[in-house]
Amino acid sequence: MAHTKIPTALHEQENFLPKKKLIIVILTLGVVLFVINIDHNGLSTLLPTIAEDLGAQKSITWAGSSQLIATTVFSVLYGRLSDIFGRKALFVSALWVFSIAELGCGFATSPKMLYAMRALTGASGGGIGNLSIIIATDVVSLRHRGQYMAVVAPFMVLGNICGPLVAAGVAKSPLTWRGLFWLISPLGVLSAVLAGYILPSTTPTDTFKQNLVKVDWLGSFTSTIAIVGFMVAVSGPGAYHAGYSLLVISLLSVSGVAFLAFLFIEWKLATLPVIPLTIFAIPDVSALLMQTFTLGWVNQANVYFVPIYAQNLRQWSPVISGVLLFPIIAVQVVVSMIAGRWMSKSGQYGLTIRLGVALLLIGSLLETKFGRETHPAYVIIVLLVIGIGVGAANQPMVIAMQAHTKKSERAVVTSSRNFFRFLGSACGVVMSAAILQSTLRTSLPAAYKHLADSPYALAGLNPRERDAIAPAYERAIRHVYIASAAASVLCSLGLFVWKDDGYESRPTENNDDIEHAPARGIEREDEQSSLIYDREPSAVSYGTVEAGEPNRLRRGG
């Protein structure tokens, strides 16, 4: 497979660290992702409350959609921008923007202000998650990458667990729903300070002005227009438009033209393309990207619509609906750690991905049976199956893509993977919302048709009214789960495309596995504490400790 040569103007940022320093860096990334995931998963629990408070019953899905769209747009850019400006500078900057955006969410006085702040949160938060993976790939060899990324998983899942609980708690406090954002903002500031001190950094070889010239501005602009136009259009018909109106058709047309322009720019014009099209010429990578998209769809649709199912159909409390997310997210930490250890010891990633996708398919099919009378034990077991599937497949897919591409493409491949994951998540939310509202429009009794415009806030209905609309809600939510099941089927088809050839399947430029320790400055984990890892003099620093000098291994002192 031929690969486009990456310009050498990009400064080297790979810096394998000694074990003790490596653990500190990984734990720092874990703390940051803990904070990000509290915000990410706490919002869905608060949607009905926010809708009532701000009078946003007709548009409250945009609290999540605006964040996901912004995350998707900017996830395309962070990989290449970090190649140009450096990982640490971009990472810390994103944390500061995230903290300011969270504060703005807490002080939002209108739906539009809230959605704007959520978009800013998505633009920065998506970059933080994206760069966390890229930074980890800089400091850990491919063979150990799954193992150390599994160390980060508990922080992410803990944030996923704490998010709904904290959100439900503050919703009942005098701070109301605003308290969640007022809590996260200072945590973001502390994370920025911590990351600024601890994370390794490199000194760019060019000036800031020279680096600005390298940015693929045309590609960035056209990709933004294409993504925003598409996402706004697909979120509209079920919620805001009576069918495919002229506005929707116009948005899709503009998006299509922008997408074609983006492809041409990346193919012919860009010196440092945002997404090198050569990676899509690798069948294995293309299949894995498709699976990443569908995995994101199913996972995010569950995170957003399980609370809707619990509160609006089953009439369970926000606390119970938050607890109901435990099976789908808490189990991921254990499964991710097991998968990481397995990949490090076996040198294979295929088994965990195949097992995860199979369980995701089974769980999604079983989920279509959720209804008003479904036993809670059945609900919990099905969500556990889906959680195990996501945990087994999600991070190993990153390793698989990196195993099929060059080291010089590492950041953009990781960025592309996150783009497809976020795009799948965004489509999962907005398309599921459109399906929900479209079904309600055709299923609700005539006296309750108006509820199709505000399906997320039913607090004002009495028990008789709730019983009258329950069949329509049951049908609408089932249609949402059927769409997720279809996405799971598509995800399973990707298993027949790629092969697991182990870490040795990568181009020779990428062979930084553990077996190549003498040539690459990598050694086995149990020997890392007695080794000093050195690189070319690229002014790489770890906090206040330097890690420069030539690329070689020295034992002891």
Curated annotation (Swiss-Prot):
It is found in: Membrane. Pfam families: MFS_1 (PF07690). The chain crosses the membrane at residues 22-42, 59-79, 89-109, 120-140, 150-170, 179-199, 217-237, 245-265, 269-289, 319-339, 346-366, 379-399, 419-439, 479-499. InterPro entries: MFS (IPR011701), MFS_dom (IPR020846), MFS_trans_sf (IPR036259). It is a multi-pass membrane protein. Residues 505-557 are annotated as: Disordered. Gene3D superfamilies: MFS general substrate transporter like domains, Multidrug resistance protein D. The keyword Coiled coil does not apply. The keyword Transmembrane applies. One of its GO terms (cellular component) is plasma membrane. Residues 505-523 have a biased composition (Basic and acidic residues). GO terms for molecular function: transmembrane transporter activity. Its main location: membrane. It comes from the Eukaryota. MFS-type transporter; part of the gene cluster that mediates the biosynthesis of squalestatin S1 (SQS1, also known as zaragozic acid A), a heavily oxidized fungal polyketide that offers potent cholesterol lowering activity by targeting squalene synthase (SS). Belongs to the major facilitator superfamily. TCR/Tet family. This is MFS-type transporter clz4. The gene is clz4.
